């Protein structure tokens, strides 16, 4: 696919098959993230790939723990793929994904969040090229900036 086809084809997918992606595909996705544009060309992103189901679920629960669903009530996303906004029965911010990649940047760096999203977008495009589903999930600070989240780091 060319880049335009990738951009037009990529979708946020919130339902996943019950199997891990191939290690080689994961490595390609991570490499795509690491070559993303970033502030000052510093290449500061650190990507942590989690393939342990129980740990993915635990981090996903931390991700959603402080999320105020009520603030977005009525912001319907999709009946085919309900989001945490639409469906209060969803207990993990990662929707049961078998692999989760967390993107970290320097604390107190003005462009860390922008850099992380550029990295994540490259990863999503690479996943699409490989025929894999993905969804960009925010709230990284809320997930790890607390005692249980910090303990996982």
Features from the language model and the residues they span:
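Small-aliphatic-rich amphipathic alpha-helix that forms the alpha element of a beta-alpha
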Residues: 33, 101, 106-152
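Glycine/small-residue-rich phosphate/adenosyl-binding loop
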Residues: 42-116
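Specificity-determining recognition surfaces
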Residues: 1-27, 43
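Short, cationic motifs built from Arg/Lys/His that form the positively charged side of catalytic pockets
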Residues: 10-14, 34, 56
